[in-house]
Regions:
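Short, structured segments at the rim of ligand-binding sites
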Residues: 1-163
Length: 163
């Protein structure tokens, strides 16, 4: 983990938003990117934590509907990043992340949202210290074996169950 990742099998002609992940990741790596999120709302939490661990400023625009998901994903994504030592600013329809090379780590909360929990795992890869996640069981909604897969790849994250 922590190596360069290549996403294969994504059809560039597909109507699925996932096809845009290559361009978004390339823009984040270049630094100072603006990424329209209207067609890729489910990717924003993961892309935002990648941006938090990459030097430069990344602005996600047209993402207001993220406030109406399992959690207010604009607010919970920023809270996750801030809990791990990153920074940014949330707007009504946007999220701006001020990336740096590494995050220190810390204790964060999934807020019961599977995408926030999985994004915490991604963020942990750019942390110099340990990460503890509250509500890790949120991944059960979409990928029950997520933590086993993450650990099998060498990922390390501690978790606390929600009360």
């Amino acid at each position: 983990l922590g190596a360069e990742i290549d996403c294969t099998g994504l059809d560039p002609a597909s109507k699925q938003g996932d096809r845009r992940v290559h361009g978004a990741l390339a823009a984040i790596r270049k630094g100072n990117a603006t990424i329209p999120g209207r067609d890729i709302p489910d990717l924003i939490p993961a892309l935002a934590v990648v941006a938090a661990g990459t030097p430069g400023t990344t602005r996600f625009t047209d993402i207001g509907r993220l406030r109406l998901k399992e959690s207010d994903r604009i607010a919970t994504t920023l809270a996750l990043i801030e809990a791990l030592g990153g920074s940014g600013v949330a707007g009504p329809d946007s999220l701006e992340i001020y990336g740096k090379d590494r995050l220190p780590g810390g204790v964060c909360d999934s807020c019961g949202d599977h995408r926030i929990a999985m994004s915490a795992a991604i963020a942990s890869l750019r942390c110099t210290g340990p990460v503890t996640l509250r509500g890790a069981q949120a991944v059960e909604k979409s990928y029950p074996a997520f933590w086993q897969a993450f650990a099998s790849l060498g990922g390390q994250i501690a978790w606390e169950e929600e009360a």
